[in-house]
Amino acid sequence: MSKELSPKYNPAEVEAGRYQKWLDADVFKPSGDQKAKPYSIVIPPPNVTGKLHLGHAWDTTLQDIIIRQKRMQGFDTLWLPGMDHAGIATQAKVEERLRGEGITRYDLGRESFLTKVWEWKDEYATTIKEQWGKMGLSVDYSRERFTLDEGLSKAVRKVFVNLYKKGWIYRGEFIINWDPAARTALSDIEVIHKDVEGAFYHMNYMLEDGSRALEVATTRPETMFGDVAVAVNPEDPRYKDLIGKNVILPIANKLIPIVGDEHADPELGTGVVKITPAHDPNDFLVGQRHNLPQVNVMNDDGTMNELAFEFSGMDRFEARKAVVAKLEEIGALVKIEKRVHSVGHSERTGVVVEPRLSTQWFVKMDQLAKNAIANQDTEDKVEFYPPRFNDTFLQWMENVHDWVISRQLWWGHQIPAWYNADGEMYVGEEAPEGDGWTQDEDVLDTWFSSALWPFSTMGWPEVDSEDFKRYFPTSTLVTGYDIIFFWVSRMIFQSLEFTGRQPFQNVLIHGLIRDEQGRKMSKSLGNGIDPMDVIEKYGADALRWFLSNGSAPGQDVRFSYEKMDASWNFINKIWNISRYILMNNEGLTLDVAHDNVTKVATGEAGNVTDRWILHNLNETIAKVTENFDKFEFGVAGHILYNFIWEEFANWYVELTKEVLYSDNEDDKVITRSVLLYTLDKILRLLHPIMPFVTEEIFGQISEGSIVTAAYPTVNLAFEDLAAHTGVESLKDLIRAVRNARAEVNVAPSKPITILVKTSDSDLEAFFNSNVNYIKRFTNPEHLEIASTIPAPELAMSSVITGAEIYLPLADLLNVEEELARLDKELAKWQKELDMVGKKLSNERFVANAKPEVVQKECDKQADYQAKYDATVARIDEMKKLVK
């Protein structure tokens, strides 16, 4: 057992050194018990781009809650940690650091640059693990993985080669999304579409014979030097006689043909479309149908190349302005039509993505997608929580495009393809024998290796490895809804293809962490929260309680310091009631307490309040376990909070004072036993959410670590509906008296007459047998409980189930004086309402003030209105008394 609890709860003291003690004791490793059912989770590997944010804290807290509970329930648990190399993101960070030193990756060369990236990785991997420790994550570091580890790299090469041999990976020249800042290809889901202010530029392309001009429109006039044709619909009577003729490309003054193609819609614009196969995906398809050349007029950094005439070397957006000016100068510009349109931006660098013809590697998705869709109709399907995300998954798989997997980066898994001077290509898991082979310089999309994470981390492709046989498929994946497409879907189809199994049985989807105004946290808004700052102020347990208790599966959660204050206050309450119980413990051990509680359950000892709290504890265990199993941690938290704060602390602990302050030593031992036993179960129930403080308190009452203590289970012997019903009626009576006192402004310290009328003889007997509790909580001068009590003329009355309660007021207050006081109070709230109403009716204030300031005034208005209405209700009640 540990040292005595400090008088005040100090999370820094409680949490200091605790994590290292757990690591030293190896309590986070699997038990190795082959008779136990395995339960495994692989951590969604954070990118080694920097420190973890609040979203990571939420994600990992939920996983830790699950794995800690399963460990306590006797499962053979594995929570496998690891990190992702995050190709484009990490490389961009390192290049940014190098730019600060005045150098580029090209100055260093590939090998030296990669050395710098590995140094970055080591630096931030250390930081991330320190953050995991502060969060209290019970991961098994002996199995830590990194996506560029040799074992995982071997899995990546095997998957690539196998898919290539099946014809499901291919290399070809197609239009892809190009990031000019990172100088790499992007997949469709790495492109974020944003509505931006732009324009349609209308231009005239003159027929070769000069007889007429065809008007075309584009949002990207700088690409016009890549135009190789204009298209018209072959059924469009305005233009079908022009098919086969030529137009003159302005500025370039070269001839390009007019082709007939259904891509040109007669109903849209002029019905004439310029065709730029190297810079537009639809034009690329038109070009293939008509065997048109592909002319790329842009460099990989977003500048114009030598085919752009005098605009060569210009940035694409500068070139756009210059080209438009030139078109106007030569009379080819018809008009500029301002319009908001959707433009793709790189998810990583934020720059506008350029559709660009490029030779890349692709994964053919049709059969992989079909397999994933079909699996959701089998017993091996993946269960989504909440279930609506199953539809999201299926919709994406039904509409998926081929996946571009090559990236023009240096940091990542280099593509296992080699070329020689004879134009031959070799694809294999190892380099080809002989000289003269050069490996493809591109690397694979980060998500290609991440898609293998659940099984590559378990030892695959070594299918006989102990971890793979024991812990795969994994039990549960926890992740945000923002990466269902990026990651979850890809893990499912790759796992089905290469292991024949689902990668995980369950997927718990959570939302995003937002600020108090509901905005997504971002650097640009400056509203990001560092979880380490929160932990420093409140402790990890308070942050974990907030994160677990704040939302339902699939929903976003709003962070606020007010909620953090409430979390800290709850833990402080637990600390204080624990100290109270321990201070009154008198050396009682948990084993003796358990034996005594058994006597309470069998009726050999104890009183009705003891049986009531044990019954409610039983219900709490059942409901919390049920909601944990459904990943409804918010519901479970609410149940725990209500039981601990309301039923245990506010009621039972207070009720025990009637016994603990008495002279009956036998009763005291029983009461202490129930207190200690219930505290023990509370700590175990809370431990998955609040590991640090529960370990600290548990050390006062038991040997060993709570990490491996048994999770509470329902004890049928504790079921006692009669005790539950009786004490709930007792509570109702006490609450009714307290509320009546408050309504007529009679202080709790002032003794009063209380009359309880009930025609239920059992209830009458119960109240009379527990009259000491009623007296302790209601402070009566006179208390009468009977079936025949005449209703007093001047009295406050309340009705509870089975009884009526009267508080005679004749000697307690002057009704006229109380009405006068209430009238003054009503005037006060009316004045406040008038002031806030005037402010909110000011259109300039509402339009110009910050939204949070306006909201604050609205909240004040609602608060004042509620107080006004309550005062009116109290006046009405008082007036009824004098009728």
Swiss-Prot record:
**Any matching Pfam family:** Val_tRNA-synt_C
Q: Name one GO biological process term.
A: valyl-tRNA aminoacylation
Mainly localized where?
cytoplasm
Looking at the keywords, is Glycosyltransferase present? no
Enzyme class per UniProt:
ligase
| Protein EC | 6.1.1.9
UniProt free text on domains: ValRS has two distinct active sites: one for aminoacylation and one for editing. The misactivated threonine is translocated from the active site to the editing site. The C-terminal coiled-coil domain is crucial for aminoacylation activity.
Q: What does this protein do?
A: Catalyzes the attachment of valine to tRNA(Val). As ValRS can inadvertently accommodate and process structurally similar amino acids such as threonine, to avoid such errors, it has a 'posttransfer' editing activity that hydrolyzes mischarged Thr-tRNA(Val) in a tRNA-dependent manner.
Q: Assembly and partners?
A: Monomer.
Question: By what name is this protein known?
Answer: Valine--tRNA ligase
